[in-house]
Amino acid sequence: MKGGGIINKFNNKLGFILTAVGSAVGMANVWGFPYKLQEGGLIFLIFYLLFIALFSYVGLSSEFAIGRAADAGTVGSYEKAYEKYNRRVGTIVSIPPLIGLILLTIGYSVVIAYIFKALVDSLTGRIMTSDINIWYRDLSERAYSVWAYHLIIIILTALTTIGSAKTLEKSSKFMMPIFFLFFVIITLVIMTLDGASDGYRYMFRLDLSKLSISTLVSAMGQAFFSLSITGSAMMICGAYLKKDEDIVHSSKITGLLDTVASMVAALVMIPSVIVFDMENAQGPGLLFQILPTVLKNIPGGRLIAIILYTAVLFAGITSLQIMIEVVVESLNYKLKNLNRKITLVLLSAFIFIIGINMEEIKIWGPFMDIISIYIIPISAVIGAISWFYVLDKKTLVDEINQGAKKTYGDTWYWIGKYFYTPLVVIICILTIII
């Protein structure tokens, strides 16, 4: 595929949904959601489910719709939105979301290299015999500590992205079912631990003191980021979707499976922390310090560690695939004579060269904070405003109804324009100022 007009499409609805879920499921599910659920309990969960339903219904479906309408990824989607003014304006508007995604891809590749290192050390048994604090410091505080793992991840991701929609679909159909299966297996093991029931009771406790604006905002932000509605990534999934597929229904299924992924992660993480009276944590500390410590102290911990890090690795790779695919497609869309394979190789080399210089967590952490606090929320606002305030209403609604089993009209559009988009702006402002 060169330039606009995507030829490769997903073979079927399952391939599309699993690829979209693969893009959405990532570290926000694995280490963000469990932490916030443990903090907020049932009140947080209720708010979260309401926002997932809303954001899937209008936010996710709008990004899928503009991608399919434009038959293109990020750049082409913005050009489509602004074509009644000037497509060049759309090109300019697409630059911040695209740059944000490139930077996110670089940072994301680092944490996936961490995960791959943890998996290898689980296979060799090193993670079970080492002092976890020393092991983690060696992993995160030493320059170029995971460069070899980093290189392998970049190569594997490039190989599974090389065939565009076809290889993305095949790899997602393989990796995402394994992700869910492995987490279910681990959940069943965790349930057998003495005290696990206390963890689940705490996890689903009804604490009315959590009925607050802060819990509401926390749930809203978590739902938003969990679905990867960033104004950049999900349009490519829509571009690869056939015209006879129901976008809104597929968006609902994607949101449901993303929620299942978050819940199974929480069912593993929270009881583990409670049973062993570990300090509540989120981010790398949960995955690379607390969980290894827990796994060292339970029967079959090494095997569970292998299963766990394999599942998380697969979730990370499927997200990284879409990020890289978005950038490759956008470059090929504008530079029509640029060979796709050459683009993929050059981009992969760029991500690796920049990424290996960020493997120390003191560099990686602030870098990812800047992206997640400032760049991604602003990009999401740009996207929401572009779809609901700039793009012609008829174009968006017609695309939503293409292949739909029921007709969506003014109500769907009104919710997107006057409810969803203001919420995205609120999330952006609160993320920046809090």
Regions found by a protein language model. Name each.
Residues M1-W31, G59-F64, R68-I92, K242-D246, ...:
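Membrane-interface "cap" regions at the ends of multi-pass membrane proteins
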Residues K2, V111-E141, Y240-E245, H249, ...:
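Helix-loop-helix connectors at the membrane interface of multi-pass transporters/channels
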Residues I6, P34-E39, T74-P96, S109-A165, ...:
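Inter-helical loop and helix-membrane interface segments of multi-pass membrane transporters/permeases
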Residues F10, L14, E169, K173-I317:
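Membrane-embedded translocation segments of transport machinery
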Residues L14-I17, S23, V146-A148, L257-M263, ...:
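Loop-to-transmembrane helix boundary motifs in multi-pass membrane proteins
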Residues M27-G40, L156-E169, L188-R201, L208-I213, ...:
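Transmembrane helix-loop junctions in multi-pass membrane proteins
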Residues P34-Y48, G67-D71, T167-M175, H249, ...:
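Transmembrane helix-loop boundary segments of multi-pass membrane transporters
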Residues V93-L98, V328, K334-S348, D369-C428, ...:
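C-terminal membrane-solvent junction of multi-pass transporters and transport-like membrane proteins
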